[in-house]
Design a protein with these regions (language model features):
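Intrinsically disordered, low-complexity segments enriched in polar/charged residues with Gly/Pro
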Residues: 1-2, 42, 133-134
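Generic signal for short, ordered secondary-structure residues
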Residues: 5-6, 31, 115-116
Length: 149
């Protein structure tokens, strides 16, 4: 149900986006970078990596949501770079690095966000659990030949 324009605030600025857009789509439209791993244009939103978390709401009612799955709403307040958001992203990077410490993508993200130590025991997997390959196989190849264990 796209078409109608919705006005809301993103990082203190009043912005508009089409009804049906996600927060991530609106952020990309306005040139705001939000990190993602599981998001892939053309695939259904998944929200599995949680790197794209943003904070919505004000004060005590503020909460973290996945920007790739959360639709824009009239009058909502979105913040993409609060201390809480950055801390959540760092934690997710730390968890993912513990799963696949050899991943160049994760090493780059860890460097970008200043994650220098991992408190969790490494598993040394190849898969970073972003879900992209599973969704591409299911949605674009119509095969459903692979999945998570």
């Amino acid at each position: 149900m796209r078409g109608n324009m919705i006005t809301f605030r993103m990082n203190g600025l009043e912005v508009s986006a089409e009804e049906g857009w996600t927060i991530l789509e609106a952020a990309k439209f306005y040139g705001l970078e939000i990190p993602t791993l599981c998001y892939y244009e053309g695939l259904s939103p998944y929200g599995g990596c949680r790197l794209c978390v943003v904070e919505i709401g004000e004060g005590e009612k503020a909460k973290l949501v996945s920007s790739c799955t959360y639709p824009v709403e009239p009058g909502m307040a979105v913040r993409t770079d609060t201390k809480r958001v950055i801390a959540a992203r760092k934690m997710m990077i730390e968890l993912m690095v513990s799963v696949a410490p050899g991943s160049k993508v994760l090493q780059d993200l860890a460097s970008q966000f200043g994650v220098t130590e991992v408190r969790f025991e490494p598993r040394h997997e190849e898969c970073i659990l972003c879900g992209r390959c599973v969704r591409i196989c299911a949605e674009q190849m119509d095969a459903k030949a692979i999945g998570f264990q």
